[in-house]
Regions:
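Short acidic/polar alpha-helix capping motifs at helix-coil junctions
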Residues: 40-50, 90-93
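N-terminal propeptides/low-complexity segments immediately following signal peptides
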Residues: 31-43
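C-terminal motif of bacterial Sec signal peptides marking the signal peptidase cleavage site
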Residues: 21-24
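Mature extracytoplasmic domains of secretory-pathway proteins
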Residues: 74-140
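Bacterial N-terminal signal peptides that target proteins for export
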Residues: 2-15
């Protein structure tokens, strides 16, 4: 009889633990916390090529060049660590080895995805630039060997709250867990 009570009590403890675990997995984030938007890769069309077909073409495009430099600010050019600059090689180096331009939909908005990496160091130093179709807002994520930098250009309030969420959603769509860049980060 005693063994049966012990088994029943253990069963109740296990059931309570399972219920707590399940509740924790389905609990909404705290109020005021923004959720990452969903992202998907779209077929490449004329919108994706609006500023060029390759990373180099997009960065040299007359409509985008100044916006990209403004996006990264003092981090664009190589230099030594100084006030206001986070990247020693400069963000420009992260796009030297570029790829073809892609089109993503993140949270219902379409973005041109421009990616690149530092030659010879692509597994740990790579970048993703997202240009909202129409060119109004830009987001970027630069992976610097385990440390990630985020950038936003456009409406200040929107950038501060969403740059990381949008850039990370785009990154996860292009490089799902187990991909080359994801393996390098873990």
């Amino acid at each position: 009889m005693r063994d049966m009570r012990v088994h029943r009590r253990n069963g109740h403890v296990w059931l309570c633990c399972l219920a707590l675990f399940a509740a924790a997995c389905t609990t909404a984030p705290p109020r005021g916390t923004l959720a990452s938007p969903s992202a998907e890769i779209l077929p490449t069309d004329a919108r994706a090529m609006a500023y060029g077909a390759t990373t180099a073409q997009v960065l040299r495009n007359s409509e985008m060049a100044d916006k990209v430099r403004a996006l990264f600010g003092p981090d664009w050019m190589p230099g030594t660590p100084r006030a206001g600059q986070m990247l020693v090689p400069g963000a420009e180096a992260y796009f030297e080895q570029g790829a073809m331009v892609r089109l993503l939909r993140i949270g219902g908005t379409d973005y041109i995805a421009v990616s690149g990496c530092v030659p010879g160091n692509c597994d740990s130093r790579h970048a993703l630039l997202l240009i909202e179709v129409g060119g109004g807002r830009l987001f970027a994520r630069l992976d610097e060997g385990g440390f990630v930098h985020y950038y936003g250009y456009g409406s200040e309030g929107v950038m501060r709250d969403t740059a990381q969420l949008i850039a990370d959603s785009g990154y996860r769509a292009l490089y799902p867990p187990g991909s080359r860049y994801q393996r390098a980060r873990t």
